[in-house]
Amino acid sequence: MSQISRTQSIMATTAQEHLETGGRINWLASLNTAFTPARNFRRTSIICTIGPKTNSVEALNKLRDAGLNVARMNFSHGSYEYHQSVIDNVRASVAAHPGRPVAIALDTKGPEIRTGNTAGDVDIPISAGTVMNFTTDEKYATACDTQNMYVDYKNITKVIQPGRVIYVDDGVLAFDVLSIKDDQTVEVRARNNGFISSRKGVNLPNTDVDLPALSEKDKADLRFGVKNNVDMVFASFIRRAQDIKDIRDVLGPEGKQIQIIAKIENRQGLNNFAEILEETDGVMVARGDLGIEIPAAEVFAAQKKMIAMCNIAGKPVICATQMLESMIKNPRPTRAEISDVGNAVTDGADCVMLSGETAKGNYPAESIHEMHEASLKAENTIPYVSHFEEMCTLVKRPVSTVESCAMAAVRASLDLGAGGIIVLSTSGDSARLLSKYRPVCPIFMVTRNPTTSRFSHLYRGVYPFLYPEQKPDFDTVNWQEDVDKRIKWAVTRAIELKTLTAGDTVVVVQGWKGGMGNTNTLRIVRADPDHLGIGQME
């Protein structure tokens, strides 16, 4: 049986098919739309928000079986006791059924602008054409009415201008700014009918606001995350690179391994995206608030631009918000929602995210299943060789030794029709760079670091394997012997999981000695349970 035919039984498409088909258009024209990809090889990770419907070990087991990779906690809601229970339940689920690691993400509330409390805490009716005031006068903080609506952003009169728009309650109500009456009052006119309740969110599109990156609540939440060893922080309403630095300062040395993912949710963040990308560990295209702050039609282009910039930088990117929203109530998604997931995958997103679908929806496991299926199909449409060639032309030279090895490993995997790439990693950086070049085959990352094994779910195509044996004393154990032992273990495990077929060619990426930053060696071995060929070139 040929190498190509063996690999074809495992992978959606083979390297040889990619090489022979040519350009992107010809590749797409030759797609077999009825092809069923291997169910155990999904490159894109799935992030799920954990809520009351799913916060139990039993429910989490079902989500993991359906395809959960990262469990998200939304700190806009819930007490510390509740979030502690989520963390405990996720870890209990993993302990009971080890399998692949599950990462835990803390999503911050972030700096927000909100209205005050209405008088008597009753909904205030608003009619189109109504002229009223938005004010920072504290006497209206608990007594909002149809004439004066309190907002808790003291500098609103300094940053807003006549002709701008103010949105309330996620854009349900829109107000045109007529004038700045004094240093506390903005005069507005309602565009549409509706109601305002207490403490509703306020958006100021196309306006640079000077809110701090972190509220006192956010700082306390981050300290809670450090204490509980969360794997990543989804940082809300990031506007500038300094915001990321401020978060790192709060996380401190104890939280240095926590990955910071910048949520881009406003025009300011979009305008400053290049500097934010340089500072952050990854990005979330948070389309909910972004779709209020900028025209909805522009979000489509912004998504593609940000994902492409992340791909070029080799940093993970998440696409989020309302991806399968209808499944909160319905057992099946709309065709438009499936297309939205597929579009995010083909754009180049490393992860896709579910919010209300798994936090409060009636069909949480089914939502993950649908996202899993949509991602698999979409991944099969990507011309990986074309992507690799373009990435090689875009990389800034000279590159690091580690990145040079990653490029060479992906090239070798394509030329050999390899069934997989095995990378031995401590920090996860080698796996991240391999993911950047999008090989056709899976990337099996072997690490002794539990945190690295979890946050590597951020990288597309990376399968984290947590090696169970402790690091030996290399004064008494030969370094290469330990390397060979880890490679054999990874090959055996990948075959057991049916993500690798016995006899496949495997590209191995390793270091010449222990520690981070020493990756500089490629080896070619054969996956054979009886004779893996370790220790010799084949």
Swiss-Prot record:
**CDD domains according to UniProt:** Pyruvate_Kinase
Q: What chemistry does it catalyse, as a reaction equation? A: pyruvate + ATP = phosphoenolpyruvate + ADP + H(+)
The pathway entry for this protein reads as: Carbohydrate degradation; glycolysis; pyruvate from D-glyceraldehyde 3-phosphate: step 5/5
Residues reported to bind substrate? 72, 288-289, 321
In this UniProt entry, the residues modified to Phosphoserine are: 45
Q: What class of enzyme is it?
A: transferase
Keyword terms, alphabetized: ATP-binding, Glycolysis, Kinase, Magnesium, Metal-binding, Nucleotide-binding, Phosphoprotein, Potassium, Pyruvate, Transferase
Q: Please name the GO terms that the record assigns under molecular function.
A: ATP binding; kinase activity; magnesium ion binding; potassium ion binding; pyruvate kinase activity
Keyword Protein biosynthesis among record annotations: no
Instruction: Write out the residues that bind K(+).
Output: 74, 76, 107-108
Co-factor(s): Mg(2+); K(+)
User: What PANTHER family does the annotation carry?
Assistant: PYRUVATE KINASE (PTHR11817)
Instruction: Report the protein name in the record.
Output: Pyruvate kinase
What organism does the record attribute this protein to?
A: Hypocrea jecorina
What is the gene called?
Answer: pki1
